[in-house]
């Protein structure tokens, strides 16, 4: 390393300065050697310049004929010049409801900016925020308005309300659609939620609306449709938030059929339907059922030993349920301390 902090050495032993282009004489040597027929890799070894640097310089020279380096340091040229900023402030002051992209289009239409040197939408928004802070205006005056809502209000002679401030309020104007316009837009939305540019153009002509307004209307209408569908789905699944998937069991489903030795249920009072979380599964088999080839039967029945009406116990002989590979210890755990029956034998079903 030579001259710390100034020069660095590449893998070929050549010195270079970080962040600075090659000197012009070195560039001229690269071009002369390339014109004489030398390959870039040989030029790289002779001049001790990296192969990538040689290839870039030659490629740019063959493409544009320019040998000098591009601009050194700095940033991109500022597009929001003082005249442009002043015009942006003037447009926003005259029409506070203007979008940033509308201001951008107006700047191009007036010839103040060329197509390739127009401030971006984010740059215009930054200018508006800076003007708002400098002038101390309320945030609603210079803020870029949100998208137009597809609101259907009273009929209006024009497609849009005149742009301007509401006296005494900081609210922006909304587009007002006549009933015929709203009906045409809604009918097209029912045919397809994503109309192409041709369909939007025809609809804009038929409704006397700007095509941008039609596009924004469809965007907002799709968002409204998604909200409605989500609400409809949530209304259909009231227990989805708790993760409940077992349906409620009405008292009439609870069977009074009993197995030998089970507690009689005829004297139990009628109960309101209980939630799915208020039922537990317990298995009980009588000795004679252990000899059968059919799975044990289960039924949902309220548990009266627990001191409440929340936890029902399963009594046999109600609902046929296949219970594979259940051993006695697991069955005893499922029955808990209910004391309804003591399983002693359990068969295994495939």
UniProtKB/Swiss-Prot annotation:
Residues 278-350 are annotated as: Transcription repression. GO terms for biological process: animal organ morphogenesis; brain development; forebrain development; regulation of transcription by RNA polymerase II; retina development in camera-type eye; sensory organ development; type B pancreatic cell differentiation. Keywords: Developmental protein, Diabetes mellitus, Differentiation, Disease variant, DNA-binding, Homeobox, Nucleus, Paired box, Repressor, Transcription, Transcription regulation. It comes from the Eukaryota. GO terms for cellular component: chromatin; nucleoplasm. Changing residue 141 to W: In KPD; uncertain significance. Gene3D superfamilies: Homeodomain-like (1.10.10.60), Winged helix-like DNA-binding domain superfamily/Winged helix DNA-binding domain (1.10.10.10). Disulfide bonds: none annotated. SMART domains: HOX, PAX. Residues 83-131 are annotated as: RED subdomain. Residues 5-131, 170-229 bind DNA. PROSITE patterns: HOMEOBOX_1 (PS00027), HOMEOBOX_2 (PS50071), PAIRED_1 (PS00034), PAIRED_2 (PS51057). It is found in: Nucleus. GO terms for molecular function: DNA binding; DNA-binding transcription factor activity, RNA polymerase II-specific; RNA polymerase II cis-regulatory region sequence-specific DNA binding; sequence-specific double-stranded DNA binding. It holds the Pfam family PAX. Residues 8-64 are annotated as: PAI subdomain. Residues 153-172 are annotated as: Disordered. Belongs to the paired homeobox family. PANTHER family: PAIRED BOX PROTEIN PAX-4, PAIRED BOX PROTEIN PAX-6-RELATED-RELATED. Plays an important role in the differentiation and development of pancreatic islet beta cells. Transcriptional repressor that binds to a common element in the glucagon, insulin and somatostatin promoters. Competes with PAX6 for this same promoter binding site. Isoform 2 appears to be a dominant negative form antagonizing PAX4 transcriptional activity. It is linked to Type 2 diabetes mellitus: A multifactorial disorder of glucose homeostasis caused by a lack of sensitivity to insulin. Affected individuals usually have an obese body habitus and manifestations of a metabolic syndrome characterized by diabetes, insulin resistance, hypertension and hypertriglyceridemia. The disease results in long-term complications that affect the eyes, kidneys, nerves, and blood vessels. This is Paired box protein Pax-4. It comes from Homo sapiens. The gene is PAX4.
């Amino acid at each position: 390393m030579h001259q710390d902090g100034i020069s660095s050495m590449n893998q070929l032993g050549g010195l270079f300065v970080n962040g600075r282009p090659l000197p012009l004489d070195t560039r001229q040597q690269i071009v002369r050697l390339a014109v004489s027929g030398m390959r870039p890799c040989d030029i790289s070894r002779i001049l001790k310049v990296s192969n990538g640097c040689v290839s870039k310089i030659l490629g740019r020279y063959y493409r544009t004929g320019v040998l000098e380096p591009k601009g050194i340091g700095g940033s991109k040229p500022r597009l929001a010049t003082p005249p442009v900023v002043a015009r942006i402030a003037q447009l926003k002051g005259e029409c506070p409801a203007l979008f940033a992209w509308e201001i951008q289009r107006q700047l191009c239409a007036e010839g103040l900016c060329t197509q390739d040197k127009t401030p971006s939408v984010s740059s215009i928004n930054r200018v508006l925020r800076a003007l708002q802070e400098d002038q101390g205006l309320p945030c609603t005056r210079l803020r870029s308005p949100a998208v137009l809502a597809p609101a259907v209000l009273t009929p209006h002679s024009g497609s849009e309300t005149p742009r301007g401030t509401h006296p005494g309020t900081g609210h922006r104007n909304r587009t007002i659609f006549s009933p015929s316009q709203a009906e045409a837009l809604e009918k097209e939305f029912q045919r397809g939620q994503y109309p192409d540019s041709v369909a939007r153009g025809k609809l804009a002509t038929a409704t006397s609306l700007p095509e941008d307004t039609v596009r924004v209307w469809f965007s907002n209408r799709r968002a409204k449709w998604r909200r409605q569908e989500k609400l409809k789905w949530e209304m259909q699944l009231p227990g989805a938030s708790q993760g409940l998937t077992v349906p409620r069991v009405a008292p009439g489903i609870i069977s009074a059929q009993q197995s030998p030795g089970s507690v009689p249920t005829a004297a139990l009072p009628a109960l309101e339907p209980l939630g799915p979380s208020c039922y537990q599964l317990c298995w009980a088999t009588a000795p004679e059922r252990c000899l059968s080839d059919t799975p044990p039967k289960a039924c949902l029945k309220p548990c009266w030993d627990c001191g409440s009406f929340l936890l029902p116990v399963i009594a046999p002989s109600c609902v046929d349920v296949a219970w594979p590979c259940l051993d006695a210890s697991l069955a005893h755990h499922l029955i808990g301390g209910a004391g309804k029956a003591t399983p002693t034998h359990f068969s295994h079903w495939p």
